[in-house]
Every structure is written in structure tokens, then in C-alpha cells.
Amino acid sequence: MLSKVRIALDAMGGDVGPAVVIPGAAISLQRHSATEFLLVGDRARIEPELEKHPALKAASRIVHTDVAVSGSDKPSQALRRGRRTSSMWLAIDAVKKGEADVAVSAGNTGALMAMSRFHLRTLPGIDRPAITGIWPTKRGESVVLDLGATIGGDAHHLVSLAVMGAAMASVLFNKPRPTVGLLNIGAEEIKGHEEIREASEILRARNLPELDYIGFVEGDGIGKGLADVIVAEGFSGNIALKAAEGTARQMAELLRNEMQRSWLSKLGYLFARSAFQALRDKMDPNKSNGGVFLGLNGLVVKSHGGTSAEGFAYAIDVGYEMAHYDLLNKINQMLNREGGALNSVQAAQEAVS
């Protein structure tokens, strides 16, 4: 457990840049005083915002660059143009050099993943990293991955996601053996494509001590909180994420419209205001902001590009928690335990095949 967490922020990332990143960092610092910030970006744009937050200024150091990755840059373009010079790259580089424990960016997702994978590399036994989110549920929260980093994947990839997701859940939820489910079109063992059925067979056959595999989970099972960890390949995981976020916004809009429809509904709202506020807080996408790139040789957190300062603060909070509780070391321990969890999984995959 780290007593002091050093966080590198891509101050130029997102739709707004320093005007959101800096106040967001100030909000997070109020919750986690044992934090030091490396603010990477254009000094001329960072300093005016930083002057508004004396406590943050005292806990921060600026690394100047006027090069930023745009939202329209393709990953290959971002690597070619922004390598070694952009605010995104330099934030990741701080993690690589050990100057920061985690990097947080609201910038271009594809570029951030490409730069992170290129510069930090993946952990032994991990072929491809995953975007991992924290999902509000009826039971509390669940870890969901992959939310769009990799389209497709074989059984070994899905099992590696299960192992990494379980490591993150054990850190977040303080559970030594979190429950894990595979997202599928049905709960029956015969449902789904070959890769997901094979992954299920491997997880059952191996019975890993790091996780409790419960089987397939349908889409509605995510919100029900049927498992601490929900595993999906990136295509279906991203669709599930966008559908849930859209539904949350639609429900909030529908409720707001109905509450304003008549004087009677307005009166009813006054009596139930605390309940509606609790519901709104539960469904607030800002509070689920912060996708962790799992599978890399370093910690990187992706924030929504269009988030507010409060939303960006939640992404920083996620990075703080992951670094403070030493998630990377936890994943490495789980991968290497008993001769390597994934090596054992590979043997199980060959036996199943």
C-alpha cells in the first residue's frame, strides 16, 4: 500500500483541457490529501487555472509541452506525431520512468491505448489489454471488462480478462475470491459462440483460487449485480456500456419531464425529493467515470472526454485507489501464483481442446 500516490495528468486531454482537469484535480485532492500531481501540458493554460487552487498548486509540478493529441487523430497518427512530445505521451512516460504511479487522461481513447501499449508494454501472459470500468448495480458495484479495447478474442484472452478483473475487484471490494461471470446471450451452457463456451469450460476445469466462476450472465444480470466481475470481449462490452449510459440519461430525462408535467406531479416530487436525489446520484455517469487499462506494465486511467470537473475527479479517484492499493503488483501476484495462473489456464485450454 502506497502512503503517497503520484499522479500524472494529461492536462490537455478531453474536450476542454485544463479548465476541467485542474479543478477536477483540486476536487480529488480534497478527498485524497496524500497525492502529488504532475500536470503535463501548456504552462500558459495550466497556470491561470492552478492559481485558483492554492492547495493543488502546492501539491503539483508542471511539465510543459504545447503538443496535444486531438480527438480526431487516429492511433497511428498520434503515435507518429505525438510520440515523445505530446502531453498524453509524457504523462504515460512519467509512469514508465517511475516518476508517477498512474497516468490519467481524458484524451482520444484509441491514441491513449496505442501509446500506453507501445510504451508500457503488456504484462507477461497478457496478449492484449482491456478497458475496465466500475458499474453501479442493485448490489453495489461490479467490475466490467473489456469495454472496447479489443474486438474479439479467443478463450485464453477471455480467461486472462477474468483473472485481471478478479484482481481489480479484490482490491476495490476487499474480497479474496470475487465472483466472475461471462457475459453471454443466455445462461445455458450451450449458448454463445465457441470461444466463450471454451472459456467457460476452462474456468470451471481450472477452478482458480483467485476467483469464483459462476457461469454465464445475460445483459440484464450486470445491473442486477449477479457477479463482482463481468467479462466480455470488447465489442459486446462497449455496446453494453453505451446502452447502459444512454438508458440512464433517458430515464433521468423522462423523470424530469414527468415531474414537471402537472402541479400534482410537482407536489409529489417535493415529498419524494430525497428518494429522487438518491436515484439520480446512483445513475450519475460521472460517478462511474474512469476506465482502467488493465494488462499493461503500468497504470493508466481513461476519463470520458466530455466530462465535468466533478466527473474528472472521479477518474482521478479511480487512479488513486488503484495505485494506493498496488493493483499492478496484485495482478502480477495472481498471474504468477502457483507457477502462473495463465500458464495453468493455457494447459487447461489444451486439455479442453
Swiss-Prot record:
Pathway: Lipid metabolism; phospholipid metabolism. It comes from the Bacteria. GO terms for molecular function: phosphate:acyl-[acyl carrier protein] acyltransferase activity. Its EC number is 2.3.1.274. Homodimer. Probably interacts with PlsY. Keywords: Cytoplasm, Lipid biosynthesis, Lipid metabolism, Phospholipid biosynthesis, Phospholipid metabolism, Transferase. GO terms for biological process: fatty acid biosynthetic process; phospholipid biosynthetic process. It is an enzyme of class 2 (transferase). Coiled coil: none annotated. Its main location: cytoplasm. This is Phosphate acyltransferase. GO terms for cellular component: cytoplasm. Belongs to the PlsX family. The gene is plsX. It comes from Bradyrhizobium diazoefficiens (strain JCM 10833 / BCRC 13528 / IAM 13628 / NBRC 14792 / USDA 110). It catalyses: a fatty acyl-[ACP] + phosphate = an acyl phosphate + holo-[ACP].
